[in-house]
C-alpha cells in the first residue's frame, strides 16, 4: 500500500515588485498548487490596482485564496489573518495539496511559519477615533514610548498597525511585543526568497503601469465611496494619489513620490527577510528562476517526504 505524503508548505517571499506573483503562478501551475496570499492589503475588497492584486485573468489560471476577505472599513488584524489562513492550509493539505504562500508582508508570513500568536482583542472604535484625532505622528511617538520594540518595527506612516498596537496596550495594559508568542506548525516548510538588483527599475516600471491602468481613477472612486479619511487610503501609493487629487502633488511629482516611498518600503522588507537565515534566495533576473525554484522544491519534497 502506497504511503501517504506528509503535509508541507512552500513560502515565496521577498520585497515588493520583485516578481513574486508571476513566478508563483508559474510554480503553482507546475505543481498543481493553490496560491495563498500573504499581503496585508490584498485582504481588502476594492483595493486592486495600487496593491498589485492579481488580476481576474491571473486568478483564473490558478486558485487564489486569502484575498478580498473584508470591507475596507473593517479592521483586519494579523490574528484575523492567522484565523483564516491556518485552517485553510490544513484543509488544502488534507486534500493532498502543497499550498504556496506568497507575499511580502513579513508579519503575516511569520504568523504562519513561526506560529506567532497574537492577542485576541476586539477593535475599539471609540478608542481608535480618539487616537486618530491625535494624528499619526503623535500616535507613533506615543507607541515609541509605550512599546519601543513595536514602534521600531512599525513604520512611522503605518496608521493601521500603529493604532492596533496602541489599542492592544490601552485595552489590555500589556505591550503587543510582550503578548506575542510562537507555536510553530508541525509540518515542514520551505521558504524561497525572490530579490533583484534591478528592483528600483522594476518599481519604476510597475508604478507607471499602475498609473496607466487607472490607479488615480481607482483612488478617486474609493474616496467617493468610503471617504478620503479611510485609513487604508493613507497606505503606500494611495497616500500619494490622494495628495495628487487634493492638489499637493503635481502630475510629474506623483510617480516620483510613489517610487521613492516604495523603495523605502522595499528596503524595510529586505531587512526583514534577509534576517531569516532559513530563506533560500533566487535572483529575479535569472532566466532559470523557475527551474531554480522547482529544483529547491523537488529537493525539499524528497528530503521531507511531502
UniProtKB/Swiss-Prot annotation:
It catalyses: adenosine(37) in tRNA + dimethylallyl diphosphate = N(6)-dimethylallyladenosine(37) in tRNA + diphosphate. Keywords: ATP-binding, Magnesium, Nucleotide-binding, Transferase, tRNA processing. Residues 39-42 are annotated as: Interaction with substrate tRNA. Substrate binds at residues 16-21. Coiled coil: none annotated. It comes from the Bacteria. Its cofactor is Mg(2+). HAMAP family: IPP_trans. PANTHER family: TRNA DIMETHYLALLYLTRANSFERASE. Monomer. This is tRNA dimethylallyltransferase. It comes from Synechococcus sp. (strain ATCC 27144 / PCC 6301 / SAUG 1402/1) (Anacystis nidulans).
Amino acid at each position: 500500500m502506497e504511503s501517504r505524503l506528509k503535509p508541507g508548505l512552500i513560502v515565496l517571499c521577498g520585497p515588493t515588485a520583485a516578481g513574486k506573483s508571476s513566478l508563483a503562478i508559474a510554480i503553482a501551475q507546475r505543481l498543481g498548487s493553490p496560491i495563498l496570499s500573504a499581503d496585508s492589503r490584498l485582504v481588502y475588497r476594492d483595493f486592486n490596482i495600487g496593491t498589485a492584486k492579481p488580476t481576474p485573468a491571473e486568478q483564473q489560471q490558478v486558485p487564489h485564496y486569502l484575498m478580498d476577505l473584508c470591507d475596507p472599513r473593517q479592521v483586519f488584524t494579523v490574528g484575523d489573518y492567522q484565523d483564516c489562513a491556518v485552517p485553510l492550509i490544513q484543509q488544502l493539505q488534507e486534500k493532498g495539496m502543497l499550498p504556496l504562500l506568497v507575499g511580502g508582508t513579513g508579519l503575516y508570513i511569520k504568523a504562519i511559519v513561526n506560529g506567532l500568536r497574537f492577542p485576541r482583542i476586539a477593535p475599539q472604535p471609540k478608542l481608535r477615533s480618539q487616537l486618530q484625532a491625535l494624528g499619526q505622528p503623535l500616535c507613533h511617538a506615543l507607541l515609541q514610548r509605550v512599546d519601543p520594540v513595536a514602534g521600531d518595527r512599525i513604520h512611522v506612516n503605518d496608521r493601521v498597525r500603529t493604532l492596533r498596537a496602541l489599542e492592544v496596550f490601552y485595552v489590555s495594559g500589556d505591550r503587543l511585543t510582550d503578548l506575542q508568542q510562537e507555536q510553530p506548525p508541525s509540518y515542514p516548510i520551505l521558504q524561497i526568497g525572490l530579490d533583484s538588483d534591478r528592483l528600483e527599475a522594476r518599481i519604476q516600471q510597475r508604478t507607471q503601469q499602475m498609473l496607466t491602468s487607472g490607479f488615480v481613477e481607482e483612488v478617486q472612486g474609493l474616496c467617493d465611496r468610503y471617504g478620503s479619511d479611510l485609513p487604508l487610503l493613507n497606505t503606500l501609493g494611495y497616500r500619494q494619489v490622494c495628495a495628487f487629487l487634493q492638489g499637493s502633488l503635481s502630475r510629474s511629482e506623483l510617480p516620483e513620490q510613489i517610487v521613492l516611498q516604495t523603495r523605502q518600503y522595499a528596503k524595510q522588507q529586505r531587512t526583514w527577510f534577509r534576517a531569516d537565515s532559513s530563506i533560500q534566495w533566487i535572483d529575479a533576473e535569472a532566466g532559470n528562476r523557475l527551474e531554480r525554484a522547482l529544483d529547491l522544491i523537488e529537493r525539499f519534497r524528497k528530503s521531507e517526504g511531502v
